[in-house]
Amino acid sequence: MRIRHRLCRFRKSKHVRHQRFRSRIFHRDSAVAKEMKKPFVVVLTGAGISAESGIRTFRADDGLWEDHRVEDVATPEGYRRDPELVQRFYNERRRQLQQPDIAPNAAHFALADLEAVLGDNLVLITQNIDNLHERAGSKRVIHMHGELLKVRCTQSGQVLDWQGDLSADERCHCCQFPSPLRPHIVWFGEMPMGMDDIYQALAEADFFISIGTSGHVYPAAGFVHESHLHGAHTVELNLEPSQVESQFDEKHYGLASKVVPEYIREFLTTCGENRQGD
C-alpha cells in the first residue's frame, strides 16, 4: 500500500487551535501537550470494522433489522408503542456482544496503536454501539449512536453501565419518581451524541479517515465534505466504495483487518520520517 498524503508538517497556529479544542473534550497529558508536530487526525468507523469480529449488521437488504421493522425497534415511537419488544431486541444484541467469540480484530488494535502514538491528536468517532474499540485499548471514543452496554433514565438522562437483560418494568431510582430505563442508543429521529465536539474536531483535522462506513446515514455521511471544507486530507478505507467515495482524496479497499493496519503502519512510518527531517 502506497499512501499518497501530504507531509506531516503543520503551522503552529493550527496546533494552537488544536490545543484549545482538545482541552474541551479530553483531559490532556502534559507530555503530549508539548508535542506540536503530530498531525491532528479524525477517524470515523462504521459497521464494516466490526463485521469481521462477528457483529451482525442490523439492516438487511429488505430493510428489516433482525426480522423487525426499523420503525418498531429503533424509533422513539416504537419504544412508546411496545417497550417490551424494544427491550427484547436490544437484550439479544447485548447478549450477542458478550459472547466469547466476539472480540476486537486487527483493525481495532491498529487504531488503538494509532492513539498510543498520537494521544490527544486523535479523535475516534464510531457509529457502532459495541465496545470493541475500548476492548482493543482505545481510551477516547465518541459513540455518536450510543452504547449497547449502557442504559439511561428516561426522566433524568442519567447513564448507567448495564451488561444484563433490561425489562420494560426496570426503573431508575435516581429521580424523585422512579422512571423507566431505556437503551442508551440513538434511535432514528433523535440527535446523535457529541455533535458539537465532532464538528469542532472536523474543523481542526489535518486528516479525516473513514473506515467501514456505507455513506448512507447522515450526518456521518457528510463528515468527509465537512472536513474537506476545512482543508483536511480525506481517506476511505472500506470493503467496497461507499456512497460518498468520490469525495475522498485517497481510497483503499479490502477487509478492514488488512487495509487498516497496513494504512496506519505506513502512515506512522511516513509521519515519523517527516518529523525527523524537520
From Swiss-Prot:
**In which residues is NAD(+) bound?**
46-65, 127-130, 212-214, 238-240, 256
Give the subcellular location: Cytoplasm
The top EC class is transferase
Q: How is the cofactor bound?
A: Binds 1 zinc ion per subunit.
Q: Residue limits of the Deacetylase sirtuin-type domain?
A: 22-270
Q: Where does substrate bind?
A: Y90, R93
For binding Zn(2+), which residues are annotated in this chain's numbering? C153, C172
InterPro entries tied to this protein: DHS-like_NAD/FAD-binding_dom, NAD-dep_sirtuin_deacylases, Sirtuin, Sirtuin_cat_small_dom_sf, Sirtuin_class_III, Ssirtuin_cat_dom
Write out the catalytic residues in the record: H145
Question: NCBIfam families annotated for this entry?
Answer: PRK00481.1-5 (NF001755)
| Domain comment as written in the entry | 2 residues (Tyr-90 and Arg-93) present in a large hydrophobic pocket are probably involved in substrate specificity. They are important for desuccinylation activity, but dispensable for deacetylation activity.
What protein is this chain from? NAD-dependent protein deacylase
In its UniProt entry, the species of origin is given as: Yersinia pestis
* Annotated gene: cobB
